[in-house]
């Protein structure tokens, strides 16, 4: 079996980062599996109560998050597909270049990547994204979403935590090491 080795340069690759690609793949698998269950067991736009604040409601989202641009006439399909593809490629390169001791940032990138690819699969194969999780409180309804959207949201929160709280610590440690 060939041994995986780190490569230098633009395409440098660290084998320890395969675990983060595994997290992305896990997010995609769970997302696609739950969307398949929703699509095969739910009737379109017919809410199934789960908890007093949660319904399973199968919906088709032709736009972006929260149905943004869903009624824009079709061009948004190409825009969102292209953006998701480009961002995914960038995130794969970024993810594979993470240092061994990094945890929060690669987890964030892996979740965002998995969520983006999960929704991209829908958009490319179905022409829309399957949403089915519907949260509400009394008459206040949050737009339906899916596991991919949840992975993107959790990844974004982790990215913000890393950026605003952990980056300063990394800079301080680097300055101490340098002195």
Swiss-Prot record:
| GO CC terms, sorted | plasma membrane
Instruction: State the organism named in the record.
Output: Acinetobacter baylyi (strain ATCC 33305 / BD413 / ADP1)
The membrane topology noted for this protein in its Swiss-Prot or TrEMBL record is: Multi-pass membrane protein
Question: What is this protein's function per UniProt?
Answer: This protein specifically catalyzes the removal of signal peptides from prolipoproteins.
Keyword tRNA processing: yes or no?
A: no
EC number of the protein: 3.4.23.36
InterPro entries, alphabetized? Peptidase_A8
Reaction(s) the record says it catalyses: Release of signal peptides from bacterial membrane prolipoproteins. Hydrolyzes -Xaa-Yaa-Zaa-|-(S,diacylglyceryl)Cys-, in which Xaa is hydrophobic (preferably Leu), and Yaa (Ala or Ser) and Zaa (Gly or Ala) have small, neutral side chains
Tell me which family the UniProt entry assigns to this protein.
Belongs to the peptidase A8 family.
Q: What is this protein called?
A: Lipoprotein signal peptidase
Active-site residues (renumbered): 131, 149
Corresponding gene? lspA
Listed GO MF terms = aspartic-type endopeptidase activity
Q: Which PANTHER family match?
A: LIPOPROTEIN SIGNAL PEPTIDASE (PTHR33695:SF1)
Q: Which pathway does the record list?
A: Protein modification; lipoprotein biosynthesis (signal peptide cleavage)
């Amino acid at each position: 079996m060939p041994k995986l080795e780190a490569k230098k340069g633009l395409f440098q690759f660290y084998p320890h980062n395969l675990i983060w690609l595994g997290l992305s793949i896990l997010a995609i698998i769970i997302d696609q599996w739950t969307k398949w269950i929703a699509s095969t067991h739910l009737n379109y736009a017919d809410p199934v109560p789960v908890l007093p604040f949660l319904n399973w409601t199968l919906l088709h989202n032709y736009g972006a998050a929260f149905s943004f641009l869903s009624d824009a006439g079709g061009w948004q399909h190409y825009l969102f597909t292209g953006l998701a593809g480009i961002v995914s490629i960038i995130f794969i390169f970024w993810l594979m270049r993470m240092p061994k001791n990094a945890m929060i940032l690669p987890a964030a990138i892996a979740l965002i990547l998995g969520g983006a690819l999960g929704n991209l699969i829908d958009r490319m194969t179905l022409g829309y994204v399957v949403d089915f999780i519907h949260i509400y409180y009394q008459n206040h309804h949050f737009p339906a979403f899916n596991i991919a959207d949840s992975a993107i949201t959790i990844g974004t929160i982790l990215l913000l935590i890393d950026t605003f709280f952990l980056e300063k610590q990394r800079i301080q440690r680097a300055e101490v090491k340098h002195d």
